[in-house]
Amino acid sequence: MASAIFVLNLKGKVIISRDYRADIPMSVVEKFLPLKSEVEEEQGFSTPCLTHEGINYIYIHHNDVYLLALSKMNSDAMEMLVFLRKMADVFIDYFKELQEESIRDNFVLVYELLDEIMDFGFPQTTETKILQEYITQTSNTVKKHAPPPIAMTNAISWRSEGIHYRKNEVFLDVIESVNLIAAADGTVIQSEILGKVRLKCYLSGMPELRLGLNDKVLFEAAGRTIKGNTVEMEDVKFHQCVRLARFENDRTISFIPPDGEFDLMSYRMSSNVRPLIWVECESIVHSGSRIEFMVKAKAQFKKRCIANNVQIIIPVPEDADSPRFQTSNGHVQYAPEQAAMVWNIKKFAGGKEFFMRAEMGLPSVKNEDIQVQKKRPVQLKFAIPYFTTSGIQVRYLKITEPKLNYHAMPWVRYVTQNGTEYSIRQ
Amino acid sequence: MVPKLFQSSRFKAFKKSETSELQKGLVSQYAYERIDAVKRTIAAMTVGKDVSSLFPDVLKNLATRDITLKKLVYLYLINYAKTHPDLCILAVNTFVKDSEEYNPTLRALAIRTMGCIRVNKIIGYLADPLRKALKDEHPYVRKAAAVCVVKMYDLDREYCASNGFIEQLQALVSDPNPVVVANAVRSLAEIHDQDPEKGYFNVVYTMTDRLMVALSECNEWGRITILNSLARFRTSDIKEAEYVCERVVPQFQHANSGVVLSAVKVIMVHIPLFSSDFTDFLYKKMAPPLLTLLSTDSEIQYVALRNINLILQKRPSIFDVKTRVFFCKYNDPLYIKMEKLKIITMLACDENINETISELRAYVSEVELEFVKQTIKCLGDVALKVPSVINDCISIFLEIYELNISYMVQEVTVVMETVLRKYPQKIDLLLPYLSRVIEELGDPRARSSMAWILGEFSHVIPTSSKLLSEMISTMADEDLQIQLALLTAVVKLSLMNGKGNDEELVQKVLNYAINQSSNQDLRDRAFAYQRLLTPENVRKAQKIVCCEKPSVSYNNNLPEALLDALLCEITTLASVYHKLPESFIGQGKFGADAIQRRAVEELNIEEANVHEAIEKGANVENLLDLDFTDPGATSASDSPITSAQPQSGSNSAMDLFMAFEAPSTNNAEPVKARSATDDLLGL
């Protein structure tokens, strides 16, 4: 629970605030940044929850603003931080971008939202689609009678009644993000797959959906075998529309979806993943005045798949200059601000191998401890369509709407991409 | 107090021309112009301009039937409700009227906003509409009313309790609508906690059924609330507890991390009751969702890691030996990396030690200074915990000595002291590096560790007396910590080597400590040693000083009682700080009261300023033009209800409060876990 919510800019100036409980002096917000830097000074880093003189500061950072909740009680820290994140999401949905300027341009709307998403410091609702039904940007359209959407307080709090589409369709995207840390010798130190099933629902009425996956637990429980592989998900998370008790009982994923786009479920597997794209990087320092890099990149996934927009970010010494690049494919850019060179490859087919050679000058005044050079990993970005690392498959998506009885088509796509961390240590 | 500068900018006078322009807009005959004007007024208010002189004009728009306009005026009111509630009383009749509206949005809005006006006088007006709203046919209104009860309770406990509002709120717990139930239990829980003896909200088994139904129908925030209420449920009946836990388990699959962790909380509260089979089952269910929290936003990860740390202390085997998931990512923020290091240390055991060590070795060459330091400390802890790995650790430390980067060398030296206490025979490996390392040490911790090493192993280190005499030459400039360590070190040196070779050195140090130093501790200790070192006592001295040291072992766990208390506080700030709530939310009522007083005081100052502004403003007569029937409510210069505390009094209260700063409940570091005599002599 929060006593007050603030939006601050990076200098600590309050852009907008809402005092929900009037039980703490609002001026304590001025302590926030000094307190944060004091903690940073003391222990070298700051944490998302700080306490000072009986006031707790709970905050997140997004673009050029801080979202800060103050409380003088032993509040639920997890709830507050998740709430602040969701609040940021609501602002992004409304203003496209959350930054100082977008808040300043929309004071009134922000106040209105702050009034609705939280009451007396208790989070109420953060479902943008429902909020948008009665807190609107088109301020001049005067609605005479706008009752609160029934969904606000309903058991189905994410979908309104009376939705109609001429053509009923569902688009299903299975997106797998691969996190991987590998050592230079090729051993995988850590790897995990974070999968997500994203739905775009254009369906009329109150449709009832059932999703079938090649879930190992489901098939083992039923004692059945199917053609092809099954996958074992270590943990699954569902959008609030999914009936959790039913899933716990018989692994059935059944739900009434929200309208439009949403993430239906996410799953995690920490099974050992072979690196999809492998990069070897060798560097030689020539007579102390120049450094030469030989880089080899290899696509180790299925031959018929193609990785798009591959980016290989290779760290170089911070004081290197005058780069020269030679490559069999793609093009290389020097990015001095991150002390790295970035090798871009538009299309990288499975089984292919590409090479790159780079040469850079080193300053004549030599850094004493060159061997002490801090090691930074090679990082990768990519997307491989029509491919999942885990082998997960959508077997069916059954759509029934008892009243309207229409026929709807589901469309399925798959893609694998890099996660927040896909790096090869040097 | 509000600094001068802040005040002046906040109450910057609003330009006359702008004011009159807005004023014109506010009384325009066209709705859209009025809406626009209110909007601009609110925008001006937000950027810190004082628009309180427009109050009467804004208020005129309240009687509108246009919901958009009404909402805007309410927003304006909420903002001023804080600074001058008595002005808001002017609007009270409209509120009462709105609470009878046909449109539920309006009814709810009126109840919600009225609750935000923090002045006792409002209660009289609020009572009837609130009573009706609690029985309203529309759940949206009931949900707002449920929260409004706690708002009223905050204003006037007596009134709220004696007029049946709490009973009405209790009835809402069995409301058919899940969101209403959630708000009702949340309000009740808070009212209960302010006065636990009254027992307003005791979760009993019969209530859990209703809560379970609401749980599966509620939105994410409602679920968190209901789970937190279920965590308040206490029973000694295993069947009941099992039933609750079983029905909470499906919530582990919810996408909202708050729901997941709250579900964990319910389980952790009840888990001590269960048989080992059911306990195993629950922990097994809990482990994957806890690990999934590590792939969320960093801040959420942080809370998860702090809680995992607690659960891991209770149940070290919960993740088997899976250390890998806790390995640091290059892009992790520092605060995450530090938490992960702690957990890696906790998980270290013979089964995973190889990958742990090779991972830690990789971290040593990372960029962030604090991270590298913590890694070195972590390596030392692992060496204490898993004896089989000591040689690997020492070889990493020696590699760092080879590299000779001063901050790393210093950290290693500090850790070395601890490691050598457990594995004294490893000193041989260190010998070649000592004289070079000593030059790199600037940090007092590292220097005193070095002094300890030189003293303790003076019989093995051939150059010990030379190195110590070098350190002693600058003794007068050193920190106390180092001086004490040096004193003990030379005494050990002389006693171990005997023969009186180092007599001169000892005398020099004793002489400095007794005659020159102004520090009592140092002097007293020097006197003690001096007496010990007399020829007739030498044997006893040897026995005392060169005795067998109690061994150190790795134990970073919290005390049992504290841990158990914190496990009932999962997801809260207490679980993040690893401190009991009492230690940081101000010493009981006293601290909280002081804060409240300061809040009130600040309001009063702002209010006084605003009053001044209004009185100066040209609009004062307009106030009287308003058609309000309640004569008592129109006086704009009513004195604030809550009288200001004398400033000095409140300040001293704050000072006192600060003096009560939370005592650190953190456990003593392993190094410090020495015996009492040991401490006394600084051995």
From Swiss-Prot, chain A:
Gene3D superfamilies: 3.30.450.60, Mu homology domain, subdomain B (2.60.40.1170). The keyword Membrane applies. It comes from the Eukaryota. It is a peripheral membrane protein. It is found in: Cytoplasmic vesicle, Clathrin-coated vesicle membrane; Membrane, Clathrin-coated pit. Component of the adaptor complexes which link clathrin to receptors in coated vesicles. Clathrin-associated protein complexes are believed to interact with the cytoplasmic tails of membrane proteins, leading to their selection and concentration. This is AP-1 complex subunit mu-1. It comes from Schizosaccharomyces pombe (strain 972 / ATCC 24843) (Fission yeast). The lineage of its organism: Eukaryota, Fungi, Dikarya, Ascomycota, Taphrinomycotina. The gene is apm1.
Swiss-Prot record, chain B:
Residues 629-649 are annotated as: Disordered. It comes from Schizosaccharomyces pombe (strain 972 / ATCC 24843) (Fission yeast). This is AP-1 complex subunit beta-1. The gene is apl2. SUPFAM superfamilies: ARM repeat (SSF48371). Belongs to the adaptor complexes large subunit family. GO terms for cellular component: AP-1 adaptor complex; clathrin-coated pit; cytosol; endosome; Golgi apparatus; plasma membrane. Gene3D superfamilies: Leucine-rich Repeat Variant (1.25.10.10). It is a peripheral membrane protein. It is found in: Cell membrane; Membrane, Coated pit. One of its GO terms (biological process) is endosome to plasma membrane protein transport. Adaptor protein complex 1 (AP-1) is a heterotetramer composed of two large adaptins (gamma-type subunit apl4 and beta-type subunit apl2), a medium adaptin (mu-type subunit apm1) and a small adaptin (sigma-type subunit aps1). AP-1 interacts with clathrin. Adaptins are components of the adaptor complexes which link clathrin to receptors in coated vesicles. Clathrin-associated protein complexes are believed to interact with the cytoplasmic tails of membrane proteins, leading to their selection and concentration. The AP-1 complex interacts directly with clathrin. It comes from the Eukaryota. The keyword DNA-binding does not apply. GO terms for molecular function: clathrin binding. Keywords: Cell membrane, Coated pit, Membrane, Phosphoprotein, Protein transport, Transport. Residues 632-649 have a biased composition (Polar residues). The modification Phosphoserine is found at S675.
